[in-house]
Amino acid sequence: MLFRSDEACAMVLGDNIFFGDGFSHILKKAADNAENKNRATIFGYHVNDPERFGIVEFDKDGKVLSVEEKPKHPKSNYCITGLYFYPAGVSKMANEVKPSARGELEITTLNDMYLKEDRLDVQLLGRGYAWLDTGTMDSLLEASNFVQIISKRQNFVISAPEEIAFKYGWIDRDELLESAKHYGKSPYGEHLKAVAEGKAE
């Protein structure tokens, strides 16, 4: 388990897709939790087949009680998604993770270490949020169909990195237009151009 620095950080699994209005506010809250409160945050999502996932159990106040990796008898129906925020010092803790009974280095073990120090919070992704794990061919197809339907019906691009960077002031209008040129007259390139020119919906 490798973390590139010992600063507060976020980690997301590459085959996970998150979608929902206001998601950026949830991320900012988790980032603040890691940077200023020295606490880790995991994200819970209700599923019907919890035995397939890492699971988080919590009380009525949202306090985390336990985390388990693919339990035979799940204590809740809330899986732990592939998005994590950790405070400074995570590298040292990650180096202490030992292989599980399955012979793997489990992220759940790291989360349990934070829980034992009473430094683990869970943020639930409720109605209005979609979490898609694209780790199988079927789930990848489902995610592709979801993105296509949302994009066509609502006429907007889901998660355009350049558009997000422009929105938050990380790049300026000229840099966005330069990025758009790389995509030529493709729908994505035209979308970035429209955003830069203030013509996007």
Predicted regions and their residues:
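Conserved beta-loop-beta/alpha segment of the NTase-like Rossmann-fold superfamily
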Residues: 1-60, 85-86, 94-95
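Juxtamembrane helix-loop transition sites at the ends of transmembrane segments
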Residues: 36, 157, 190-193
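Short, amphipathic C-terminal "tail helix"
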Residues: 170-171, 175-201
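Short, solvent-exposed polar/charged micro-motifs at secondary-structure junctions
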Residues: 51-54, 131-135, 168
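Flexible, glycine-rich loop/tail regions that form catalytic "lids" or insertion modules at the edges
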Residues: 125, 151, 161-169, 194-201
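Catalytic-core segments of class I nucleotidyltransferases/pyrophosphorylases
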Residues: 10, 24, 31-32, 63-162, ...
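Generic helix-packing signal
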Residues: 4, 34, 147-148, 169
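Residue-level recognition of short, well-ordered coil/turn positions
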Residues: 35-38, 119, 170
